[in-house]
Amino acid sequence: MLKPALEPRGGFSFENCQRNASLERVLPGLKVPHARKTGTTIAGLVFQDGVILGADTRATNDSVVADKSCEKIHFIAPKIYCCGAGVAADAEMTTRMVASKMELHALSTGREPRVATVTRILRQTLFRYQGHVGASLIVGGVDLTGPQLYGVHPHGSYSRLPFTALGSGQDAALAVLEDRFQPNMTLEAAQGLLVEAVTAGILGDLGSGGNVDACVITKTGAKLLRTLSSPTEPVKRSGRYHFVPGTTAVLTQTVKPLTLELVEETVQAMEVE
């Protein structure tokens, strides 16, 4: 049956929700896929000498902590690194693909790759898959145009900013960055601000945790700092508790005899020549 063409209205459309509910009623045993929440806090900012990137180290599988010391800062080029949030496999393989392309590009042209080139390849690749590659990336590096920082989203959109944060803990991290960021910060001040931003994401989000990793990129090279800070130290137990028998009163007691049926078995030894 034909329907009149109407102008799309703004807001959330519940057509797919009604469709999924109808399919669940008609097809017994059908499991409608649900959106998977991924947890990470990644951040980056530009300071006077370059770019500094930071990330937490927790990898989760739904509500289970799969890895407490996961590396989320990926190598792209000697002066370009990338932080990955979202699906760990998608972020890992996407950054590996771009790193190999940048190596071939450097060998064929004889020039160092630019940060804008890396960002362009990433956003074109992610846009091609229309968000099915769940990788949110922060690209930072230093080239002949100076320090640059980009945020790339899973659907291919991007933005160039002096500071940014992505992941499930981005709200807490951005609150710290927006409050304390200043242009032309020193390395010590930028490093302290980055640690505070990622720590805020770790403490404010259950999907983020572990330690704080960082990567400092300048025109002379990059330095990866593993376990720069450990905001969530394990709590030490005060001691073990011992309770003597009779501490807890027994109110009722019931004894049920268990009948067992004895079965006789004969074992025949194997003849060995």
Curated annotation (Swiss-Prot):
One of the Pfam families matching this protein, by short name: Proteasome
- List this protein's GO terms for biological process: cell morphogenesis; humoral immune response; proteasome-mediated ubiquitin-dependent protein catabolic process; T cell proliferation
PTM comment:
Autocleaved. The resulting N-terminal Thr residue of the mature subunit is responsible for the nucleophile proteolytic activity.
Where does the record place the site Cleavage?
Answer: G39, T40
Upper lineage is: Eukaryota, Metazoa, Chordata, Craniata, Vertebrata
Known partners and oligomeric status: The 26S proteasome consists of a 20S proteasome core and two 19S regulatory subunits. The 20S proteasome core is composed of 28 subunits that are arranged in four stacked rings, resulting in a barrel-shaped structure. The two end rings are each formed by seven alpha subunits, and the two central rings are each formed by seven beta subunits. The catalytic chamber with the active sites is on the inside of the barrel. Component of the immunoproteasome, where it displaces the equivalent housekeeping subunit PSMB7. (Microbial infection) Interacts with HIV-1 TAT protein.
Question: What is the protein's species of origin?
Answer: Homo sapiens
**Which disease is reported for it?**
Proteasome-associated autoinflammatory syndrome 5: An autosomal recessive, autoinflammatory disorder characterized by recurrent, polymorphic disseminated cutaneous rash with annular lesions, non-specific lymphocytic infiltration in the skin, fever, failure to thrive, and persistent hepatosplenomegaly. Disease onset is in early infancy.
Which residues are trimmed away as propeptide when the chain matures? 1-39
Q: Where in the cell is it found?
A: Cytoplasm; Nucleus
Q: Which gene encodes it?
A: PSMB10
- Swiss-Prot/TrEMBL catalytic activity: Cleavage of peptide bonds with very broad specificity
Keywords from the UniProt entry: Acetylation, Cytoplasm, Disease variant, Host-virus interaction, Hydrolase, Nucleus, Phosphoprotein, Protease, Proteasome, Threonine protease, Zymogen
EC annotation from Swiss-Prot or TrEMBL: 3.4.25.1
Q: Where is the active site?
A: T40
Q: What is this protein called?
A: Proteasome subunit beta type-10
Phosphoserine modification sites are S230
Residues recorded as bearing N-acetylmethionine in the entry: M1
| Cellular compartments per GO CC | cytosol; nucleus; proteasome complex; proteasome core complex; proteasome core complex, beta-subunit complex; spermatoproteasome complex
Q: What is expression of this protein induced or repressed by?
A: Up-regulated by IFNG/IFN-gamma (at protein level). Up-regulated by IRF1. Up-regulated by TNF (at protein level). Up-regulated by tetrodotoxin (TTX) in glial cells. Up-regulated in Crohn's bowel disease (CD). Up-regulated by CD40L via the NFKB1 pathway in cancer cells.
What family does the Swiss-Prot or TrEMBL record give for this protein? Belongs to the peptidase T1B family.
Function (record text): The proteasome is a multicatalytic proteinase complex which is characterized by its ability to cleave peptides with Arg, Phe, Tyr, Leu, and Glu adjacent to the leaving group at neutral or slightly basic pH. The proteasome has an ATP-dependent proteolytic activity. This subunit is involved in antigen processing to generate class I binding peptides.
Molecular functions per Gene Ontology: endopeptidase activity; threonine-type endopeptidase activity
The annotated consequence of F14S reads: In PRAAS5; uncertain significance; impaired autocleavage and maturation
